[in-house]
Amino acid sequence: MIDISNMNLHLNHKHVLKDITLKIPISGEIIGIMGPNGAGKSSLLKSLIGSFNASGEMNLYDKSIHKQLQYITYIPQKAQLDLDFPINVEKVILSGCYQTIGWFRRVDHASKMKFHKLLRDLDLESLQYKQISELSGGQLQRVLVARALMSDSTVYLLDEPFVGIDFNSEQLIMEKLQHLKNQGKLILIVHHDLSKAEQYFDRILLLNRTVRFFGPSHQAMQPQYLNRTFLFNVTSTLKEGSDISND
C-alpha cells in the first residue's frame, strides 16, 4: 500500500501540491496521472522518490517511502537525460539490474537471460551496441523501459513515457506494462492524451495541484470531472484526441 497523507509541496514560493491524500494498494494496476500544464503531475512522482522535499506523510508498506526506494523504479522524462553521455544501449539496460544484484558485481546468468529477452520483446536487438545519442525518441524510451524492467521492483513510476514516440514503440511498451500489472505490480504513469486514457488505465488520478478525482478510468472521463480538473470545457478536445497537458 502506498499511503499519502496531507502531502504539500512548495517550489519557488509556489504551492505546487496541496493537501494530497491517497491510498493505493499494490495489487496489479496501471494508474494514469492526468491534468493540465503546471498541475504538479511530475512533481508528485519526484516527491515520492525524494527528489523534492514535500511535507506530509508518504508511506510504502507502513514505512517512510523514502526508506523503501529499493521497491520503486522511476523512469524520468527523456528531456531530463544527458544524451551526449557516451554509453551504449546494452550498458544502459544492464545498469538496471544493479538494484537487484548490487553494485560492482558481475552480471549473473539470470540477469543476462532477462536482458536478452527484453531486447527481443522490445525490438532492441539491432540496437544493442548503439550509443544512446543515435536513438530515435521511441527507441530511447524502449531502452529506458527495458532498463526499468531489469529491476525486480514493486512500484514503477513513469513520467510522460509516450511523448514524442512512434505508435509501435508505444504499443510494445504498453504490452510490457500490462505484463507487469499481471504480475501484481503497481504502475503510475503521467500521461496527457485523453483519447487513450480508458484504454490504458484501470484508474485515473485527475490532478490540478490537488486531487480533483481518483477512481475508475471510465468515470474520470466524465465531463464534470474533466472540467473540474482542466478548468475549461474539454469535450471537444476529447473528441479530437488532442494532447492537452505537459507537466
Label each region the model flagged.
Residues 131-135, 139:
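Conserved ABC ATPase signature
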Residues 191-192:
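H-loop/switch region of ABC-family ATPase nucleotide-binding domains
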Residues 204-217:
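H-loop (His-switch) and adjacent beta-strand-loop-beta switch element
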Residues 156-160:
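Catalytic Walker B motif of ABC-type/P-loop ATPase nucleotide-binding domains
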Residues 109-127:
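Conserved ABC ATPase "signature" region
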Residues 56-68:
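Conserved ABC transporter NBD signature motif
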Residues 218-247:
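ABC ATPase nucleotide-binding domains
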